[in-house]
A protein has these predicted regions:
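Conserved short beta-strand elements that form part of the metal-binding/catalytic scaffold
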Residues: 2-33, 82-89, 167-193
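Extracellular structured ligand-interaction cores
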Residues: 5, 35-37, 70-72, 82, ...
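Vicinal oxygen chelate
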Residues: 14, 39-82, 90, 150-157, ...
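Short secondary-structure boundary segments
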Residues: 16-61, 65, 111-129
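N-terminal beta-strand motif that seeds the catalytic metal site of vicinal oxygen chelate
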Residues: 35-40, 90-154
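Glycine-rich loops and low-complexity Gly/Arg-rich segments
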Residues: 43-46, 62-66, 87-90, 99-100, ...
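Short helix-to-loop capping/linker segments positioned immediately adjacent to catalytic or ligand/cofactor-binding
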Residues: 61-64, 130-136, 166-167
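Conserved small-residue-rich
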Residues: 135-179
Length: 193
């Protein structure tokens, strides 16, 4: 972590995961194009459990959600920037596009919309008695993906796929979203209208 003038870098013991620049005279407009949220991926459920437990202890408003293929919680920073904290859980299921919508299939074959409340007690069962909630993020923590608000999902897909070269992992006009990939990861870039 470092701070110099109006800039700061945040990380997990290695390279910076996030660079911040303070611009005190700028006004924030919600719902415009730009950042929707960025996501921090934890190496395992135990580390995510520590992060979520810390939010609970600090009474920081967050929204634990079970996307089946990931366990996650959402929160906003003081300026309203969306943040997702998550860990992968592919053993629980996967997502597909069906009838122009994103759906998830659990490992047992049952279907879900992937937006269920997270069972936080089950998540907290991964904590150990000596886990400290005030420890820094583990070094394996990284930025998992970024979601952008876009004016038109198809135009954005045409650009990021056709010009930049991302793979299209899924596109839903019903949900007004797209998941784009590089190297097979489910979506280092998400697009939402």
């Amino acid at each position: 972590h470092w701070r110099e003038g109006n800039k700061a870098g945040l990380g997990a013991g290695g390279a910076d995961l996030l660079l911040l620049t303070e611009e005190p005279n700028l006004k924030r407009y919600r719902g415009t194009t730009g950042l929707y949220h960025f996501a921090i991926v934890f190496p395992n459920r135990r580390e995510l459990a520590r992060a979520v437990a810390r939010l609970f202890v600090l009474k920081d408003r967050n929204h634990p959600t079970d996307h089946i293929m990931t366990k996650t919680t959402y929160l906003d920073d003081p300026e309203g920037n969306g943040i997702e904290l998550y860990c992968e859980s592919p053993e629980d299921g996967t997502f597909i596009i069906e009838n122009d919508d994103f759906v998830t299939r659990r490992a047992d074959g049952s279907w879900s919309d992937g937006r269920e409340p997270l069972d936080v007690e089950a998540l907290f069962s991964h904590l150990k008695e000596d886990d400290r909630l005030d420890d820094l993020l583990p070094a394996e923590t990284r930025v998992g993906h970024v979601h952008l608000h876009v004016r038109n999902v198809q135009e954005a897909v045409d650009f990021y796929h056709g010009i930049i070269g991302f793979d299209v992992m899924g596109l839903s006009s019903t949900f007004q979203a797209a998941f784009l990939s590089a190297g097979g990861y489910h979506h280092p870039l998400g697009l939402n209208a």
